[in-house]
Amino acid sequence: MNRDTSPDLHYLSGFGNEFASEALPGALPVGQNSPQKAPYGLYAELLSGTAFTMARSELRRTWLYRIRPSALHPRFERLARQPLSGPLGGINPNRLRWSPQPIPAEPTDFIEGWLPMVANAAAEKPAGVSIYIYRANRSMERVFFNADGELLLVPEQGRLRIATELGVMEVEPLEIAVIPRGMKFRVELLDGQARGYIAENHGAPLRIPDLGPIGSNGLANPRDFLTPVAHYEEAEAPVQLVQKFLGEHWACELQHSPLDVVAWHGSNVPYKYDLRRFNTIGTVSFDHPDPSIFTVLTSPTSVHGLANMDFVIFPPRWMVAENTFRPPWFHRNLMNEFMGLINGAYDAKAEGFLPGGASLHGVMSAHGPDAETCEKAIAADLAPHKIDNTMAFMFETSQVLRPSLQALECPQLQADYDSCWATLPSTFNPNRR
């Protein structure tokens, strides 16, 4: 069991484990899942994150032992205030970049502040990704669950205290959190306001990638993923329960807290990970390896090696390659790249890409270091140096990402993004090799 920065929070260590946790001694049944009478008069309930008949190594399910079953709720009604959504923007092959989105002035909780940026599938599809930027300036008083997909949260500003059915975790910038599809949770702001990124994964649950020839260690090590221990609320007071279903918000009112799980066991769990613990792999000879070596989590498809989504980071690291153009190379990619920046600067862009901002390079969209970065890299003294105080990341998808109407029409869209490559000179000389 691990203790995080908050003295009242404890975590279980590991990834893909069969965890077990109880807030009261003996609350977990012994030797079976659904006894006739569960300890303490609790109800047994199964939360399935995958189909029953998946391979055992890929199953995600958790047994919950709770004060009241989730079935105890009235009819859901569609909320008058709906999330920003609507049809995706028209076909647009251009490279796009956005400045940071402002945090709203009006009171906005976590689920009210989602700005849809890009997506590649409707919520009911069994694969695909929708990407948002969240902004909030007040804590949630209601409870939320997302029927449309698994949520990967990447804070850029402000710490979050996330109370889930399975326990409580705190997440700060340079950490991430993953919340399974359908799990109820509430987000409280520890710093007054918050901003960050969300990848809503409609496909196979995220997992750590295979390491191949890297071996048995490296990248995101399983022991650094932390799942909260059991914690329950026994409050009997009105609370709104909101669900996101096919992109819409529907709600009902309960007379009790739905975060009332006293004990649980299983593998369908929320977790957090500190990106500063990523064991970065890179060249110690020449050339710039493929960015797949920076993959933290992946959602696979049925095609081996082709991801529904990869979550990739560009952390602090030493650059030592000899006789090498060290920034990320110029590229035209089969995959689609949505990038964000948590802090510092990205080594391929000298200006214009700011923390809280974003960029989109779609399939076969030519991209690479800007003119200033390129000029400096060609002339650089190739002594070892460290890229420090930075954390950029990428959501990379196999299906084409299409920007939302809101993303295309917002004032933060940089109209002059293409100009960062406009002054790249031709240095070709057929008489000099």
Swiss-Prot record:
**Which key words tag this protein in UniProt?**
Dioxygenase, Iron, Metal-binding, Oxidoreductase, Phenylalanine catabolism, Tyrosine catabolism
Which GO terms of type biological process are on file?
L-phenylalanine catabolic process; tyrosine catabolic process
Chain residues that bind homogentisate: Y346, H367
Q: Which reaction does it catalyse?
A: homogentisate + O2 = 4-maleylacetoacetate + H(+)
Where on this chain does Fe cation bind?
A: H331, E337, H367
Q: Which SUPFAM superfamilies match?
A: RmlC-like cupins
Disulfide bonds, paired cysteine numbers: none
| Gene Ontology cellular component terms for the protein in this record | cytoplasm
Q: Which cofactor does it need?
A: Fe cation
Which catalytic residues are annotated?
A: H288
User: Record's Gene3D superfamilies?
Assistant: Jelly Rolls (2.60.120.10)
This entry's Gene Ontology molecular function terms read: homogentisate 1,2-dioxygenase activity; iron ion binding
Q: What is its EC number?
A: 1.13.11.5
Q: What class of enzyme is it?
A: oxidoreductase
Pathway assignment: Amino-acid degradation; L-phenylalanine degradation; acetoacetate and fumarate from L-phenylalanine: step 4/6
Which InterPro entries did the record assign? HgmA_C (IPR046451), HgmA_N (IPR046452), Homogentis_dOase (IPR005708), Homogentis_dOase_bac (IPR022950), RmlC-like_jellyroll (IPR014710), RmlC_Cupin_sf (IPR011051)
State the function annotated in the UniProt record: Involved in the catabolism of homogentisate (2,5-dihydroxyphenylacetate or 2,5-OH-PhAc), a central intermediate in the degradation of phenylalanine and tyrosine. Catalyzes the oxidative ring cleavage of the aromatic ring of homogentisate to yield maleylacetoacetate.
Family named by the database record: Belongs to the homogentisate dioxygenase family.
Quaternary structure annotation from Swiss-Prot or TrEMBL = Hexamer; dimer of trimers.
Q: What is this protein called?
A: Homogentisate 1,2-dioxygenase
**Gene name of the record:** hmgA
